[in-house]
Amino acid sequence: HALQFVDTLQGDDTTMNKQAEDGKKRFSGIELPGRTLGIIGLGEIGRLVADAAIKLGMKVIGYDPKITVDSAWSLSSEVKKAQSIEDLLRHSDFISVHVPLLDSTRHLINASSVKIMKQHAILLNFSRSAIVDEDAILNGIATNKIKYYVCDFPSEKLQHQKAVITLPHLGASTQEAEDNCAVMVV
């Protein structure tokens, strides 16, 4: 790769510079300070996400009907309590889901949920795929309710959609995590 790059430098570098500058517009981002992150599920991971978002200058609202006393005590006082999941969905620019897959959470994000989201919301689901109704997600993308759906387990249906961003599922892909798994087995 290095030699290919050196070879391209022998050509007209103004062309390369123009291509790089012209291409930047495709990668515009979103300013996070002042935006609202709604977190569904305030267990260990949800609390860590809340803390990180606060450090980035985001407003954070949380919803967790099963929050424990210990979890509540360790939650930042800057996290505002949503009165309901609907309340959270209506007021969040970003929605991050951190709940286990149970009968009560299957399709937690469904057509009704998507309908009340803010326009152009960004939905992050690093729980389980069945937490969301995929047809509702696709409809939300088509109607611009959902700007992006971000996950680490895309299904065939969602995998190649333009507004679906897939990240690798690497939560347990560290040397320490593998060592801990080995210790638990023994």
Question: Model-predicted segments: where are they?
Answer:
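Phosphate-binding beta-alpha-beta segment of Rossmann-like dinucleotide-binding domains, i.e.
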Residues: 1-36
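Adenosine-phosphate binding glycine-rich loop
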Residues: 147, 159-186
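Oxidoreductase and adenylate-handling cofactor-binding alpha/beta cores
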Residues: 1-10, 51-58, 184-186
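Rossmann-like adenosine-cofactor binding region
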Residues: 65-157, 173
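Short, flexible hinge/linker loops that cap or flank conserved catalytic cores
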Residues: 26-33, 54, 115-116, 158
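Short beta-strand "acidic-cap" motif of Rossmann-like dinucleotide-binding folds
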Residues: 60-62
